[in-house]
Design a protein with these regions (language model features):
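Surface-exposed molecular-recognition determinants
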Residues: 1-344
């Protein structure tokens, strides 16, 4: 077993298969009884309907809304559509997810909001614990960030100064939610320029980034830097480069020709972020955490006895994307179909 600083992985990530009821306040509780987890991000997909029949992907995130109260109403982010992000106010009667609860979440039934609570339909939910909900926008240009604009490991920070040295202005970092234990961070960055660097508040170099513009001008983009035990690599050399594609679209996961300037302390704005001027981007960032997460590349052999990919732990979720060919992202988890042979 790989050495890990994550004592209980289920405190940071859970998978839930559930059924819609069509009724108001459909409370979904996680299956695990050893610990509870209040999620910050929930990715949901219908098992009963394809995307063309209304079974859309939605990423529910409490951090995207500019919330100041205690009620956590999630925004709806559409990963594989160019639809703009749907924001909801402080009313618990709006939005498909009424609340993120102490050990699950509660669904609504009103109108189109019941898209993930249709009676008789089955759904999958992949749920992450980030760093909690920041409740203020950062306006500081140097030194400490505005109080409560960053939440670290569930605690709002009243006087936090980024330790990393970076070139982008501090005022571009509007909100941050970071889980330093599991290695995941959410950021809202606005008005940056290509090449600007910003702290990502994690303990190691990011290996996967999901980016969604605030406007409806593009699908969620996935950037993946291939990793091994010791270094970041690319098949054509040792540069810190990777692969990029739109989330769950049937496009080719192609080589990203640029060298990434991401390091163990900062990440770099890219020329296709569309962040110039007042445009904002939302970033969900992961770094590899031994015993909790693994990001790597393998080569298929075309046989029923396929290659064995070492993770160092028993994964609850495996996401696969074929490189260099038009194919969707594929999700495997420990709750949807569990008939595969388990190899400890």
């Amino acid at each position: 077993m790989a050495y890990t600083t994550v004592d209980l992985a289920q405190s940071h990530f859970k998978v839930k298969r559930y059924s819609g009821t069509g009724s108001n306040s459909n409370a979904i509780t996680f299956d695990e009884t050893t610990n509870s987890m209040q999620p910050d991000v929930v990715l949901v997909k219908s098992r009963s309907k394809g995307t063309g029949a209304g079974g859309i992907w939605v990423l529910y995130s409490i951090m995207v809304n500019n919330q100041t109260g205690g009620t956590k109403i999630s925004s709806e982010v559409y990963p594989n559509a160019t639809t703009a992000i749907s924001h909801y106010g402080s009313s618990a009667t709006t939005g498909a997810l009424k609340s993120m609860d102490s050990n699950g979440f509660t669904l609504d039934s009103e109108g189109d909001n019941k898209r993930h609570n249709l009676s008789g339909d089955s759904y999958m939910a992949w749920c992450w614990k980030f760093g909690g909900n920041p409740t203020a926008d950062n306006t500081a240009t140097s030194g400490a960030m505005t109080a409560n604009s960053i939440s670290i490991d569930g605690t709002l920070q009243s006087n936090h100064t980024p330790s990393a040295s970076f070139t982008g202005g501090l005022e571009h970092i509007q909100r941050v939610s970071v889980n330093t234990v599991a290695g995941c961070c959410w950021m809202k960055i606005s008005g940056a320029s290509n090449g600007d660097t910003f702290p990502h508040f994690l303990n190691s170099t990011p290996t996967m980034i999901w980016k969604k513009p605030q406007s409806g001008t593009g699908a969620m983009e996935v950037s993946l830097v291939e990793a091994n035990e010791d270094a970041f690599f690319h098949e054509s050399g040792t540069n810190n480069r990777g692969k990029k594609d739109d989330f769950v679209n049937n496009a080719s996961f192609a080589d990203d020709a640029r060298d990434y300037d991401n390091t163990s302390s900062v990440l770099a704005a890219e020329d296709d972020w569309s962040v110039n001027g007042s445009e904002a981007n939302y970033l969900w960032i992961w770094s590899e955490t031994p015993g909790f997460s693994r990001y790597n590349r393998y080569e298929g052999n075309g046989n029923t006895n396929g290659p064995k990919v070492m993770c160092g732990f028993k994964p609850a979720l495996v996401i696969i994307k074929r490189v260099g060919a038009s194919s969707p992202f594929i999700f495997f988890d420990n709750k949807n179909k569990t008939t595969n042979t388990t190899i400890e």
